[in-house]
Amino acid sequence: MPVLIRGDSNMIVMPLSYSASAIARSFEVIEEITIAEKRYLIIFDKKTPRASIVKAELEDVGGELRHVAVAMLELNNQKSIGDNVISVERFWEDSSVLQVEGVCVDRRYQELGFATQLYEALVIKCGVILMSDNTQYEGGKALWQKIAKSSNALSVFILDSDAGLFFPYDGTKAIYDGISIPEEKIWSVHPDVEHFGIVLIAEDKRRIETLTFSNE
């Protein structure tokens, strides 16, 4: 993710919708949330993989009752990282690692924190590790910084995927709080690809606190 591309992502913006049968067939409902007195379902397709937040109440879409999506996450299963092809099992033996390839939120709902809700639900409810992409738009950068600064559920770390080391790259692992590490050490601005190998990692904060306590 650390090559920052100025401007907005070219990802297609919703609306997207799913039939109730499609959700039952392909997705697991991992959480139900209520925001602004409206109910939403967080759904996860582990096989593809992909995740979405959809309205719990069915709506008429082209004459068919469907669950309308308000946010979606495109993901990719990661078995290795970096130019040196380091196995992710070196860092996480008992967790799946999913790389975030794209996140999209309906513009009408962008102030409601749905992207953060998606990240937190996947890590906490499904036990996965989330990894940023190696290229990123400003919106993605802002989202990772927001999660690092404000999330009560997730801890964020900076990983040099080529060297196989976490910041500060001395064998330890420092939590990033959104401001504690200078931006120029994480992101290089396109066309500069100096930090292409740097990725951000989101893990379950409870697990990190448990490991820290056990090592004291």
PLM features per residue range, with description:
Residues 1-110, 120-131, 138-216:
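Non-catalytic substrate-recognition and accessory regions of acyl/acetyltransferase enzymes
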Residues 112-114:
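A short glycine-leucine-enriched loop at secondary-structure breakpoints
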Residues 117:
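P-loop NTPase Walker A phosphate-binding motif
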